[in-house]
């Protein structure tokens, strides 16, 4: 309640948050509406469902002050059911990927091109690879290199050596896959 009160006052254009915040807002503001039996029926009627989805989308955006152009989430995976509903509402959201050692962003995609269940594509200053024989089908460690990837840990050669492959790619410790378009799909931790 405190966060949404501040959002109404500040009226941000961009919201950067963790998925848990959006999931809690969904569960408190939207789920009670769309999970009613009558709403489930109405949401299944073509045409009428778009009117309902637009109203719900506006309710969500107004909860953030009414001026939000994009919601960027990161730090964890977004609940697939919540993502499904956000897509139905045409909510302008995306999920990015990064870590402190990457200052902090490594992957992102504009909300209108964002691939479901991904965390976007490597940003312009970063290359990402999957340490796998088949990075499109077999999970492997996500590795990165580029301008904003750290060069090492301050005064800690041992940790720096462990953080990089012999050919200079930073080990993220995250497991994932790529698709043909370069979208990254996180599957866990190594």
Where are these regions (language model features)?
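Conserved ATP-dependent adenylate/AMP-binding module captured primarily in the ANL superfamily
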Residues: 2-14
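Short secondary-structure boundary segments
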Residues: 19
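Active-site glycine/GP-rich loop and adjacent strand/helix microenvironment
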Residues: 77-88, 105-110, 119-124, 134-138, ...
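Conserved ATP-binding/catalytic segment of the ANL
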Residues: 129, 136-190
């Amino acid at each position: 309640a405190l966060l949404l009160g501040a959002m109404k006052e500040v009226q941000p254009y961009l919201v950067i948050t963790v998925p848990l915040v959006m999931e809690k807002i969904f569960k408190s503001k939207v789920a009670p509406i769309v999970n009613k039996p009558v709403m489930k029926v109405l949401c299944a009627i073509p045409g009428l469902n778009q009117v309902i989805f637009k109203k719900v989308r506006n309710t969500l955006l107004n909860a953030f002050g009414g001026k939000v152009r994009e919601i960027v989430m990161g730090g964890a995976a977004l609940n697939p059911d919540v993502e499904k509903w956000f897509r139905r509402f045409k909510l302008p959201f995306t999920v990015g990927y990064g870590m402190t050692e990457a200052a902090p962003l490594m992957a992102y995609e504009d909300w209108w091109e964002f691939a479901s269940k991904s965390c976007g594509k490597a940003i312009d200053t970063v290359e990402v690879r999957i340490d796998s024989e088949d990075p499109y089908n077999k999970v492997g460690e996500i590795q990165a290199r580029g301008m904003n990837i750290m060069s090492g840990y301050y005064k800690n050669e041992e940790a720096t050596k462990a953080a990089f492959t012999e050919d200079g790619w930073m080990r993220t410790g995250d497991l994932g896959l790529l698709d043909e378009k370069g979208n990254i799909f996180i599957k866990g931790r190594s």
